[in-house]
Amino acid sequence: MREPTNRQGSPGPGEPRPPAQGRPRFPTWILWVALLALALWNVYTFFWPSSGARLNIPYSAFIQQVEGENVSSVTIRGQRVSGTFTEEVRVAGDQVLSPGDPVPPGTSPNEIRTGTQFQTTIPENSQTELVPLLQSHGVTVKIDQAGGSVWPSLLATIVPLFLFIGLMVYLGRSMSRGQQNVFSFGRSKARVYDAERPRVTFADVAGEEEAKAELSEVVDFLRNPMKYHAIGARLPRGILLVGPPGTGKTLLARAVAGEAGVPFFSVSASEFVEMFVGVGASRVRDLFERAKASAPSIMFVDELDAVGRQRFAGLGGGNDEREQTLNQLLVEMDGFEPHQDVIVIAATNRPDVLDPALLRPGRFDRQVTVGLPDRRGREAILRIHTRGIPVADDLDLEELAAATPGFSGADLANLVNEAALMAARKNKKIVERIDFDEALDKIVLGTERAMIMSEHDKRVVAYHEAGHAVAAHFSPGTDPLRKVSIVPRGQSLGVTIQAPEEDRFNYSRAYLLARLTVMMGGRAAEKLVFNEMTTGAQNDLKEATLLARRMVGLWGMSDEVGPVYLGMGEQHVFLGREIMQDRDVAEATLERADEAVQRLLREAMERAEQLLRKYRDKLDALAEALIAEETIGQEKITEILGAPPVPSAAPAAAADSV
């Protein structure tokens, strides 16, 4: 299946601009190093204009040293004169001290400098008089004509100034970009899939024919909007895809965009909400503006319940930021201009928690149920996912679809991928049915565990699973057995798998009672054979109790309570909602319901014990076979137990594990 290439949308409306790639960026550290070096150089030249060994002396002291024959050479650079004394001198402030001269009072030792290198500044137009004086005293004179140029000092002043200005401009632009980044929190993060990209079509979607038929009307509207506008028809502004996880809600939305050939804006509802208050509402506005600018277009919001959850539900009040986002979404959806040609498609697997204002006509006024595929749908999905995989010629996808009841499209895709991994691990060139069987066991039961068990524990587990199998085989109306194993997988020490012959969507009381009997078969076998009870029945008791509570409190299948709905056995996602809801049931009724649950479980235990005592020889034979072979398939089970007394019905699959 081809997926459309996704790219980030641009901040503004219209055609998105892909981000620049490979754009050279100036290394900012070079600018900082250069600026620091120039600053240090200017500071150094300001405080130490020449080498640190040169003594700054007044011009008058310089003339005294020349007349005293203590100057050997000088270099004249404009008005700056530097040179070398014949003998070392001391300088205290502005005075040059000859050897033997006293130090002026009040002069600290740190203020006295000594050396032979000096520099001074001569008055203007004094060079013509100075040179003959120097020559008359035998001083070597060097004239540096470049020293009179103003360019070095000019450059030393201008270059740092321009560098400083450049740095300020750069920092200003960086701050501007930073402000844009701050304000970009309000930009939508929607990904855009346009018509020029590889697209998903309805041919890539299988098992949801009813949903595809519903959405084909949307496709026709986007292709031929004038046909609907001409007669005054208006397409639903919002379409809500409802279904369990993994059933293909997002894939259906992409298929609608691919069939219609219009821009497709995809965003997760959780991306609307950020740490800053008001960002979510701003992103909603931005997303709708972009979608309107690209009309006709499709806007897809995944996991709508992240922001569309009912306001002020549960304890502790609501979330102000999320509710602001929801309010903005409500306003935008109800504020479309007529015939805007923008369709909002959203997906959720929790429609029961959505705010009622979202579901009213004018917003999400059409709901499309995307349920689990049936047997034919699973076969079609398997054909799509095996198109690019070399499978064995004798692989029966119809039979494989029958062995995977309750699997969603995502589950089937995972099954095909796991089977391919199994085959690759064995260095096979094609994927065979045994690879699919191993992948199915791994997904449903978990990975095999290398576990060393004592002979007694192994025997207990074998009889436990054999008890489930015998109860399932000889209880009328149960699902046929597919496999029994005492190989530890996942959290279980063993497993008994029952596979249905057909999909069933309605369950009778007789079938549910038989299921309770099968669940109690493991504990009954432990009591019958070992006269002991183990912790291996924990999961069986949990599932049996939950099923019995539903039979009594949800489906009205007990004589003590009668046909009444008590809400027992329901799963409450929000703790606050469960605590705050009213209890319209009397305590006496709840007590009778508990007694009815206990009676159902006791009777199931008695039926299981009767079956195992009646077929004790079958129980022993199956347990010994499990101890010897660890895993027994359907043919071996039939060989040991024989044919079931009554043809089995076709309910949904089940697995009982220790």
Curated annotation (Swiss-Prot):
Location(s), subcellular: Cell membrane
GO cellular component: a single term: plasma membrane
Signal sequence residues: none
Stretches of the chain found on the membrane's Extracellular side: 50-149
Main location: membrane
UniProt membrane topology term: Multi-pass membrane protein
Segments in the Cytoplasmic topological domain: 1-28, 171-658
InterPro entries assigned: AAA+_ATPase, AAA_lid_3, ATPase_AAA_core, ATPase_AAA_CS, FtsH, P-loop_NTPase, Pept_M41_FtsH_extracell, Peptidase_M41
Cited HAMAP family: FtsH
Family of this protein: In the central section; belongs to the AAA ATPase family. In the C-terminal section; belongs to the peptidase M41 family.
Name this protein carries in UniProt: ATP-dependent zinc metalloprotease FtsH 4
Naturally occurring in which organism (per UniProt): Sphaerobacter thermophilus (strain ATCC 49802 / DSM 20745 / KCCM 41009 / NCIMB 13125 / S 6022)
